[in-house]
């Protein structure tokens, strides 16, 4: 799940329009038993009822069968179940999208890739007239450390955009430690 969240964090902070394919917001899997690309075209898993809530049609009339076994079975992975869980991928995605919408620098701002010595960490800045967002992504399964040149913003506060808590004060050569597959969205204020 950490890799899925990391990938979606990158999707929402890199330049361009983020595209979420149906089912990605709940971690819906593929039916690898189906030929060609049909494995990714299974019915949306809305709830744990008949046909996963996708259709009232007879099961045989569906374009593709619902995923009914394994890790991605509709009884386990569906919208209704995740709506009840505040820590679910669906609710996390909703918060991620809402946070992105609240910060014009994400998606509309000027993008600047930072180049730390540690290439396991992908750091970049998104800047607009309204705000500056420092996005950090640890692409490694290990704890990673790096130093970033943030002298331009020395003395300003770093605010975690999800928790709204102060992360720290910017120093010219900021030392950052990220847990495996961790990501941070930090506003520079």
Regions found by a protein language model. Name each.
Residues 1-133, 139-147:
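Loop/helix patches that line or flank the sugar-binding groove of alpha-linked glycan CAZymes
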Residues 47, 114, 149-151, 179, ...:
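A structural detector for beta-sheet-dominated domains
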Residues 48, 162-165:
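Residues at the C-termini of beta-strands that transition into short coil/loop
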Residues 51-52, 166-168:
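A short acidic, often aromatic-flanked loop/helix-cap motif at beta-alpha or helix-coil junctions
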Residues 96, 158, 181:
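A residue-level signal for conserved active-site and pocket-lining positions in enzyme catalytic cores
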Residues 137, 167-170:
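A conserved amphipathic helix/loop scaffold
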Residues 143-163:
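Beta-strand-rich binding/interaction modules
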Residues 169-189:
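C-terminal beta-strand-rich structural cap/linker in extracellular carbohydrate-active enzymes
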């Amino acid at each position: 799940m950490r890799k899925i969240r990391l990938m979606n964090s990158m999707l929402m902070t890199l330049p361009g329009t983020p595209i979420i394919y149906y089912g990605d917001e709940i971690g819906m899997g593929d039916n690898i038993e189906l030929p060609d690309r049909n494995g990714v075209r299974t019915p949306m898993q809305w709830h744990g009822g008949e046909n996963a809530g996708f259709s009232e049609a007879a099961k045989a009339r569906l374009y593709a069968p619902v995923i009914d076994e394994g890790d991605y079975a509709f009884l386990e992975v569906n919208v209704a179940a995740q709506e009840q869980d505040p820590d679910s991928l669906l609710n996390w995605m909703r918060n991620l999208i809402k946070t992105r919408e609240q910060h014009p620098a994400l998606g509309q701002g000027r993008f600047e890739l930072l180049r730390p010595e540690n290439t396991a960490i992908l750091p970049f800045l998104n800047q607009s007239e309204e705000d500056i967002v420092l996005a950090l992504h640890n692409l490694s399964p290990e704890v990673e450390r790096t130093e970033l040149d943030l002298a331009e913003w020395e003395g300003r506060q770093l605010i975690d955009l999800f928790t709204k808590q102060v992360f720290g004060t910017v120093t010219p050569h900021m030392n950052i430690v990220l847990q495996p597959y961790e990501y941070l969205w930090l506003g520079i204020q």
